[in-house]
C-alpha cells in the first residue's frame, strides 16, 4: 500500500472505507516501507466534541493536554520519517486547544525545513496560520459537526 492510516478503529466504520486497520503502538512499530500519504488521527483531549459531550470541558487538564501534545509531535515525527518525498501527511485532532493544534504544527514547521503547509480549498473550513478548523455550522443539514483541526503537510 502507498497510504497509511493511523486512527481510531471507528473511523473505518464511520467513513465506510475499505482498509486494513491494525491495532499497533504506532510509536514502537517498525515500518519497512515509506508511504505517499499518511492520515494521522492523533489522540487528543477531544475538546472539539463538547457539543455532544459537554462534560469534556469540565475535565480540561493542562498537564494532560501537554502530554497529548508531546505524543502528537512524536507521532508526526515518526510519520515524517516514513513519508516519501512529495508525500502528504494529514494531521487531524478533534480539539480546538492551541496546544494540540496550531502549536503542534508550528513546532514541527520550525524543526523541519523540508515540510510545507498545503492549502485546503473549502468553504466548510476556517483558516488559521497552521491549519484549518472544520466549521461545525457547515453541516447544519446533518445536525451539525464536532470541531476538528486539520493540517496537511507536504514533504518537499
Feature-to-residue mapping (PLM):
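Single conserved hydrophobic/aromatic residue that forms the stacking wall/gate
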Residues: 1-11
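Conserved Rossmann-like nucleotide-binding pocket used by diverse enzymes
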Residues: 5, 22, 90
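Short, glycine/charged-enriched secondary-structure capping and boundary segments
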Residues: 12, 35, 52-55, 104-106
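S-adenosyl-L-methionine
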Residues: 12-32
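Mobile active-site "lid"/loop adjacent to the S-adenosyl-L-methionine
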Residues: 26, 41-75, 95-100
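C-terminal catalytic and target-recognition region of SAM-dependent MTase-like enzymes
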Residues: 27-28, 32-39, 43, 85-156
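A short glycine-rich, Lys/Arg-flanked "PGG" loop and its adjoining helix->strand segment in the class I
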Residues: 73-85
